[in-house]
Amino acid sequence: MPTIQQLIRSQRKKVEKKTKSPALRGCPQRRGVCTRVYTTTPKKPNSALRKVARVRLTSGFEVTAYIPGIGHNLQEHSVVLVRGGRVKDLPGVRYHIVRGILDTAGVKDRSQGRSKYGVKRPK
């Protein structure tokens, strides 16, 4: 506990909040170009082949982003929109690719939770 005299001499240090998505530089989303599209396995106790992509963002960062939903049309040089949001069982994956915008197609035959997967309302 500092004395009054110590507080007069120097103020209390402000606790700075550390961002969980530094590559976005404070923006809600960023555009990027896929440099590699591949699958990876989650950590224990889960088992799957998760679809991820290495993306070079306009902010200059190269990040690993998760491709949500069933099936995708992404390949190298695809232009994608990246948002924040980690994948709990994939270490180092702190971003998601937004479906249904730029080069990323929406999920086929999706009827529930459509807005999260870039699917228009079926006629």
UniProtKB/Swiss-Prot annotation:
Subcellular compartments: Plastid, Chloroplast
InterPro entries: NA-bd_OB-fold, Ribosomal_uS12, Ribosomal_uS12_bac
Lineage: Eukaryota, Viridiplantae, Streptophyta, Chlorokybophyceae, Chlorokybales
Stated name of the protein: Small ribosomal subunit protein uS12c
Cell wall biogenesis/degradation keyword on record: no
Family per record: Belongs to the universal ribosomal protein uS12 family.
Coiled coil: none
CDD domains xref list: Ribosomal_S12
Keyword Plastid: yes
GO biological process: translation
Alphabetized Gene3D superfamilies for the sequence: Nucleic acid-binding proteins
Primary localization class, coarse: plastid
